[in-house]
Every structure is written in C-alpha cells, then in structure tokens.
Curated annotation (Swiss-Prot):
The keyword Transport applies. Residues 155-235 form the RRM Nup35-type domain. Keywords: mRNA transport, Nuclear pore complex, Nucleus, Phosphoprotein, Protein transport, Translocation, Transport. Belongs to the Nup35 family. Functions as a component of the nuclear pore complex (NPC). NPC components, collectively referred to as nucleoporins (NUPs), can play the role of both NPC structural components and of docking or interaction partners for transiently associated nuclear transport factors. PROSITE patterns: RRM_NUP35 (PS51472). This is Nucleoporin NUP35.
Amino acid sequence: MEIQSCIEPMTLGSPTSPKPGAQFLPGFLMGDLPAPVTPQPRSFGLTGGAEIRSPLLAGGSPPQPVVPTPKDKSGAPPVRSIYDDLNGSAVGMSPLAARKQPFAGVHTPLSGLQGTPGTVSNFFSPVSQQRKTTLSPAQVDPFFTQGDALSSEDQLDDTWITVFGFPPASASYILLQFAQYGNILKHVMSNTGNWMHVQYQSKLQARKALSKDGKIFGEAIMIGVKPCIDKSVMESLDKGSTSSSVFTPPVKAPCTPSHPLSTPRSVMRPLSAAYKASSSDYQVVSDQQTPKKDESFVSKAMEYMFGW
C-alpha cells in the first residue's frame, strides 16, 4: 500500500499513455507524405463525386482509371499539386471544380480563335500559333508608296539615307548636323517636301546617321532617318545629273593655296641675291696710297721720348 501511495501522486498528474495509432499533430506538419493507395472499386453512395466522371464530361475521351487519394486528415490543407489543373485531372478536387474542369478541357476548332481565358490549350493550339506568326499588312506611309516599284532583285546603295521631318527653312541646319557623322558626298533636297536624300562616303557613316532616328535637334525639331529607297535618285546621280551637289562642312574644309605650287610668285628677295652681288663688276678696290704705321727703330725711339 505504501508503494502504491507513492506512485499514485505521480500518475494522477501525468497524461495517459497514447494509443498506438493516435497522433497529436496532423501529418502534413510532421512532413508525412500521403501513402499510395491501390485503386479499389467504390460504390456510388460514397462521398467523392470528383472521381465519378462520364465520357461525355471528359470531352469524348475514353474513361481513365481513377486513383483515389487517401482521405485528408482533419485540419490539413489540400495536398494536390497546382499542376493537376494543367493535366486535366480531377483527382483531389471538389465536386464543383470537377464539374467545371471538363468544360474547360473541351475545345472546339473555334475556341482557339475566341481565346477563352483560363484554358491552357489556347496558348499551345496551332490556330493561336498561326495568328501570332501572321504579319500585319503594310501601313500606308510615304516610304511604302515609293517602294511599290522595287522588286526583290533590286540592290540599293547602303550609303544613301533619307532625312525627313524638318521645316524647309531648317534644311541647311539639319544638313550641317548630319555632316558631323561622316563625309557627305551628295545630297538632294526636295522641292516641295520636308525630306532630303544624303549619300555618305561609307556604309559605316550611313549606319551612324541611321542611329539618330528620332533625335531632337535645336530642342524643337524631331528628325526621322530611314534608308533611302528612291532608286531614281541614286541612278540619276550616278549618271552625272546636275541635280546633285557636293556638300563639304566648313569645319572640315582644308586650306588650299590660291595658286599652284609649281609656279610660285614671291615678292621677297631670294637668299642667293647676296652671292650674286659679290660676283658683279662693281667692287670696292683698295687704294695703294693709304698711310700705314711706321714700324722702324727711329719711330719707336721718337714715340718713347716724345710720346708720339
């Protein structure tokens, strides 16, 4: 009795031993994975309308074997993957979601054109891919109307560009700005329009000018630059037409002499004039009667005595 009285206070406050199959925390918090369960025939009276699918709801496809998932534990969130919707599987879904899923999977030939949101096959259907790759028709712009006469065999000169978008009064200013990107060989101004065709010395200079498309000059003029497609301008200039003019920026103008170097006209006396004057007939002749100092003994004695 004494041993039982000593043990009794300890056993009264301690919890009873847990049962073999009881758990205090849900399995998803303990990191337990759902164990695979072999498919078993189930009656229609069981709750689980997600597993009951007819061929009509599946879009006419033959019925597939349904693998039921184990029953979720109390208080646990759903454990199915988010990719189950993409695969078209209704396993682990509620009955309401299982009814909506077959309708989302059924696609008619026109469903790709309608683009119903929420359907995955719209992004991968051949009809939608064909619509994405279809090019839009050419827009109506001045360059497109000029390019009607071009064919695939025509080869354009890449050194030509077309500058447009400036008022006619600022044509010389724009031409001076584009002269900073390279050596301009020729340029053709439009008589009535707001564009001009410019030819550079190299293709690299033309590409540098093409990169200035959309640049604002003088804080008021936005300029557009495109490759020149006016083949008539290129052909007329190649034949030596008088409509072209060579533009050289004043900053890069070299200083050339006004007369050829082969025939110099100088007003300065050449350096050889002094040598020619020394050999002329007029020379200074020394006089023979020029007095000289006497170096004799008597003159030295007189200079010593009298100080002469």
